[in-house]
Amino acid sequence: MAFLKKSLLLVLFLGLVSLSICDEEKRENEDEEEQEDDEQSEEKRGMWGTVFKGIKTVAKHLLPHVFSSQQS
């Protein structure tokens, strides 16, 4: 009977250790995914800034020509 108790405790202990390791790996994977998402959102924000600067530059050069052609 004592042998069965020890075996059962050993199985439960090994199961808990295995479960703990799996949970830790899962958390690490989730952290990596969050970091990738953060990097992608930073890239998108940077891209929008570049787009707005480009639009501003184009508008700055085109608007004087549009207004001068309307006055003529």
UniProtKB/Swiss-Prot annotation:
Subcellular location, record wording: Secreted
Region (Disordered): 24-46
Protein name: Caerin-regulated peptide
Top-level taxon of origin: Eukaryota
Tissues in which the UniProt entry reports expression: Expressed by the skin glands.
Function: Has antibacterial activity against Gram-positive bacterium M.luteus NCT C2665 and against Gram-negative bacterium E.coli K12D31.
Proregion residues excised on maturation: 23-43
GO biological process terms on file: defense response to bacterium
Family per record: Belongs to the frog skin active peptide (FSAP) family.
Biased composition (Acidic residues): 30-41
Alphabetized UniProt keyword annotations: Amphibian defense peptide, Antibiotic, Antimicrobial, Cleavage on pair of basic residues, Secreted, Signal
GO cellular component: extracellular region
Signal peptide range in chain numbering: 1-22
Predominant cellular place of this UniProt entry's protein: secreted
